[in-house]
Amino acid sequence: MAVRRTSLFAGCCLLVLAGLAAEPQRRPVFLNYDDTHYAASRSKAGVVPTEDEVRGLVRQYRGTDVTDLLFCICGRIAGVTNGVKESWCDKYHQTAENGRQVSYTNHYLCVYREMEEELGLDRYALWIDEARRSGIRPWLSFRMNDCHCTYEPTSFLHPDFFHRHPECRRVRHRAASGYFDNCLDYSIAAVRERELKFIREMLARYDADGVEIDWLREVYCFAPGRESAAVMTAFMRSVRELADAAAKRRGHAVRVLVRVPADPETALRFGFDAAAWADEKLVDVLVPCPRWETTDNDLPTDLWKRLLRKTGVQLAPGLELRICDHPWKAPFYMLTNQIRGWAAAQYSLGADALYLYNYFDDPGWKNPKTTYWRSFDQPQGTKGVDWANQLKWLKEIGSPEQVAAGQRDHMLTYRDLVPLWDEVRRPFPARVEKGAPKFFRLATGRIPAGRTLRLRLGVKGGRPPSQVFVNSRPCRYLGNEECVPAFTSDPICVYEVPPYTEDAAVVEVLADAPAELSHLDLQVRQICRGTDPAKRLLLGGR
């Protein structure tokens, strides 16, 4: 009898282990929540803030792959009344600014004033508490050098510090002319101490699991030519000390996450020696990320992974909201298939986690008049950021297996942030000369067997290039189609791509006459049984 019981127990254990093995492995997903979005979206949707509604923001993410919520508590204005910076309440009551009469009482920020002064609702305390109840780690996020509206004489985003201390701006040797010239100069001790003092006060007030130091709002922290990695590393040591002191008081770890430019060289040229921060254990999570113009589908995640080797720092590449392949064209919102494609590529390149920026909720999403994410070029319900769509892909993005197996698109984009003396690389328009191959590279990650692959080229005039190869494998021309959404107005030439096992697609284009290309993407679709193969490929598996 004892032997039978032991065998039965062992059999049950094996079944449990088999079930665990079959369950897709989940990775952490960090989601940054903007400091103004709650007020802007609730005001637009006509939502009245109550404690339950405030907590409901966090409850929406239960059952998704979001493991960490990073609540922005300051850009240039603080989210709550404090002893260091002006708050939204201060701006609401302001009547004079920069020698001019102002009134911000009809602005959507009045929602925050009502919550704090009339209802007694501390949204950050409620969000932190509800996050823990929901099994989500709560963080406080700090934008270190935001510069929205700095060329306007008055703004609800201007602190008095900005007006009173022009000597603290990064460009003082000439008249300010560029968007970032009025950013603050971190070589000035008063600038650094002001930020550290605010972080210290917020960590004393709130029991957060971590702090995000967001250097991408903005990276322009020094006068041109005076970028100092030593100054920034010393600053990060101070942040680490504040986090460790908070951890000692709270009895749990308080981690440090930093958001930096997409590639290590650009980060260093701006003064951010992220590799040194990792070596010194000053940070726990590193987020290389584009600035804003477009998602970067060619993040050097594999290079960052090598730099962080043996440091224990978690690598979480960042996804932006928008996508574009021409710096001078209006961008589009990412599509769900493009989000899957980006995630699959990042996991294949070595990402430990993923980070989402500008992906917010939308309480008015059911009504076209109140929805926050409106676009005249993309119908409601077709964008990845549309709330109903978010709630679907947020349940799969934490699984490398799920995003790799699903329908996904990989579009060639560009890097939107480069050192001051460099120029943004523009992939299009791209000229293909007769008889001279033109090369492109798409990071795709491994593609499972049983998939159809469609390479799509935007070609001016619509004449298909005579030869196209992917990873030295010849591709078959299938026909032309319209680009929807209109990433390009040129006809799209579609090619069937043979299966490949590499992590990236190196595309080689040859033409028997000069050609101009305006778009490139690769669509990965599951094979639909019972459909003519050529028709299936031309329709993209839809």
Stretches found by the model and what they are:
Residues 26-51, 91, 95-129, 139-201, ...:
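Active-site-adjacent "subsite" loops/lids of carbohydrate-active enzymes
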Residues 31-35, 253-255, 259-261, 305-336:
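Active-site clefts of carbohydrate-active enzymes
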Residues 39, 46-52, 74-79, 261-270, ...:
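Acidic-and-aromatic substrate-binding clefts and catalytic sites of carbohydrate-active enzymes
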Residues 52-79, 83, 205-210, 282-286, ...:
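Catalytic domains of carbohydrate-active enzymes, especially glycoside hydrolases
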Residues 66-117, 221-222, 287-292, 302:
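Aromatic-lined carbohydrate-binding/catalytic grooves of carbohydrate-active enzymes
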Residues 66-77, 285-295, 331-411:
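Substrate-binding cleft of secreted/luminal carbohydrate-active enzymes
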Residues 459-541:
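Beta-strand-rich ligand-recognition modules
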